Amino acid sequence: NKNGTAIMLIGVLTFTAQAVGITFDLASVITIILVGLFLETGSGGIPGGGLIIALIFVKAFNLPLEIAAIVGGIYRLLDMGITTINVMGDMVGTIIVSYSEKNISQRL
């Protein structure tokens, strides 16, 4: 349900890390994926909530919040794309379940 949020979290973390010149090893990448998964799953569906989750995500890896806060200036624009990705993911999931339960016409 929150595919867009997961993508945005990784994008903000990558942007912040590159801005300060930090690289991640394989263990860090696995940790990033797991922490991102937990934060994305636990985030609420409130407008602007993804930005707060992104700041928590950045702080969890001891990166400066000031750089990640730059994203806050354009978050409204990002949120439109994030919402679109979330809705498209939900629609695809619904269509797959409908086909598997044979509740949908084959003409779709």
Labelled PLM ranges:
Residues 1-40, 94, 104-108:
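Helix-loop-helix junctions within the multi-pass membrane cores of secondary transporters/permeases
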Residues 3, 13-16, 34, 61, ...:
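Hydrophobic transmembrane alpha-helices
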Residues 4-10, 44-54, 88-91:
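Transmembrane helix boundary and interhelical junction motifs in multipass membrane proteins
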Residues 16-20, 38, 54-65:
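Interfacial segments of multi-pass membrane proteins
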Residues 41-44, 64-67, 81-86:
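Juxtamembrane membrane-interface segments at transmembrane alpha-helix termini
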Residues 57-59, 66-68, 73, 92, ...:
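Canonical bilayer-spanning transmembrane alpha-helix
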Residues 74-106:
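Membrane-helix cytosolic exit motif
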